């Protein structure tokens, strides 16, 4: 770790001396826990895991994050190994969950290695939702000259991007975590909250979210950021979530 810290600090110092505003991303794949020291040595973002592949999850079980180098990390793997680092993120220093694979559809190349056979549009939309609420830098890697309608819809959703770019800079915290569900809460600069509801299972499920269970008391207006409309008001949300889908809501106190 100390060798890595020394080397990255040398690079950060050189970038500062250039007199230009340059973002410095630390990439050692999370092996040396850069969230603990990345900002200290001058980094603005640091990778949390092995490289992402174009798939939902690793097809082989892994015991720790390092094993993802061999099995290939999918969307769900990177999410799971990035849940505990919210305290280290904020304006000017971010946990980088790697690139967006939205719209790749199994394209050959590094993203297609280690079982990267592609994802469904539902899974790509989930990545956009999850990376946004987790404040990960958003870097599209598809060919923007040849985007289909679904890829454009996912990548260009201004309401979703606004959650990622919110000035408060708070990373979401996972309030519910089990084999079937993840539920995330992220406070926003204007007092609203973003909530993401991920169905981890291979089938559609009905979900009932009581906002009080998430630490949010009172009544809220519930806006679905993918449907672009208000879908309810009150102290809870009920609805169906498709397999591997992530619902993303903005809650406004009423």
Language-model regions, residue ranges each:
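Solvent-exposed beta-hairpin/edge-strand motifs
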Residues: 212-227
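Carbohydrate-binding surface patches
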Residues: 125, 131-134, 139-141, 177-216
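Extracytoplasmic/secreted cell-surface and envelope-processing proteins
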Residues: 1-9, 32-37, 56, 205-206
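Extracytoplasmic, non-cytosolic globular domains
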Residues: 1-30
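C-terminal beta-strand-rich structural cap/linker in extracellular carbohydrate-active enzymes
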Residues: 232-254
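Glycan-recognition surfaces
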Residues: 20-138
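Catalytic cores of secreted or luminal carbohydrate-active enzymes
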Residues: 126-175
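Hydrophobic, well-ordered secondary-structure elements that form the walls
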Residues: 195, 222, 244
